[in-house]
Amino acid sequence: MTSKPMTRRPTANNHRNRSPETAKKLGQLHPRNPHQGRYDFVALTHALPELAKHTITNPKGEPTINFSDSAAVRVLNQALLAHYYGVKFWDIPEGYLCPPIPGRADYIHYIADLLAQTTHVNKDNTPPTGKEIHALDIGTGASAIYPIVGSQSYGWRFTASDIDPISVNTAALICETNPKLKSAVKVKLQPEPKRIFANIIGRQDYFDVVVCNPPFHASLEEAMEANSRKQHNLQRHRGKNENEQISRSSTKSGNAAQNLNFGGQHKELWSEGGEIAFLTKMAKESQDFAEHVGWFTTLVSKSENVKPMQLLLKQLGVAQMRIIEMSQGQKSTRILAWRFNTDEE
């Protein structure tokens, strides 16, 4: 994506011929990410006719939706999943995160590059595909977005975990209801909220990669302040490329203000100590499962947390560590990846 609105969707050759490095410099999605440019409302409405009821016209005369309307955002996600990933049923409860799919997909495609460069499954360094690749999604949420994108883009198997029973039941229902997902994704409840890998990774398990989108706020108040800023930005940038918008489902329960298009249970949005505390716990616990995982990876939303995590991982004796930058319009984020074994071992 560019920071300016695009008037047409780029062709496959326009973006697939770019390198990931070029995409980052241009603020664009990964070249293999199908969610390039503006949303194709003709194709999306064909995949899910219900989207037409939520489609409006922006000041430029282009079709879009009201991203402050949680119902419209949910239907847009349903259309995207139906059109690009063949998912016929997808729904989440009120008040749970309705993730922006283009950005979530970028994580998976950059992870595919990491595996291509380090697993040596394919001699030409193309991303490995098929069920031989087993991925673990920590904190999958009710949406199960990473398992959906990863399994349908590359054919990988996924185990998806969460500490919230409603999220686990919802994600399991989505996977059980869609034949394409039923044999590809297994959803597990983490019975101990303070543990990450224990109870999920068994003695005989091996995962090629772990993915994680951790809660990054330290309190509900901090999360609500961030949401208010995002809502303000939604109003300021209305009419820009929709893929830069933050998709959130509204909440009607809990302690959050009901007039905010908030989205997300407390377990999804914040944890004690915030992002750095969660990442620290994840890194320390990863030591105990070094022989069971190829690459541990996680998103790091706050750039100031990168250096402390690098220092900690060095202290823990990791063999390899990588920072993978991602850029989506004017938003930048990164993946922190580490492992305890080298390519040769």
From Swiss-Prot:
Provenance organism: Psychrobacter arcticus (strain DSM 17307 / VKM B-2377 / 273-4)
Chain spans, region Disordered: 1-35, 225-258
Annotated protein name in UniProt: Ribosomal RNA large subunit methyltransferase F
Pfam families according to UniProt: Methyltransf_10
Any one of the GO BP annotations: rRNA base methylation
Enzyme class: transferase
InterPro entries documented for this protein: DNA_methylase_N6_adenine_CS (IPR002052), METTL16/RlmF (IPR010286), rRNA_lsu_MeTfrase_F (IPR016909), SAM-dependent_MTases_sf (IPR029063)
Bilayer-crossing regions: none
